[in-house]
């Protein structure tokens, strides 16, 4: 079963991802929705998560720092960046952090 944390500050995007995942995948549980990096870190510490969908441009702690933190706390979790930015520097940083996938 996928236990997913969605990290996205835009409510419409967050809700769309949640609905899409729940309607199209079997064995999915959305265990948390974070609107900021701070909320994401709190949820990483307190919830059973094995897949993270992380936006890069979020308030507080940015998405890359959330990913870095998640990699330390949840080394086996799948981490997917969700972003509207197609900047090479973001992709390069994501590779260094061993992100599993990158969705534009």
Stretches found by the model and what they are:
Residues 1-3:
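Non-catalytic signal-transmission and effector/linker regions of two-component phosphorelay proteins
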Residues 10-32:
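Two-component/phosphorelay signaling modules centered on CheY-like receiver
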Residues 41-43, 50-104:
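CheY-like receiver
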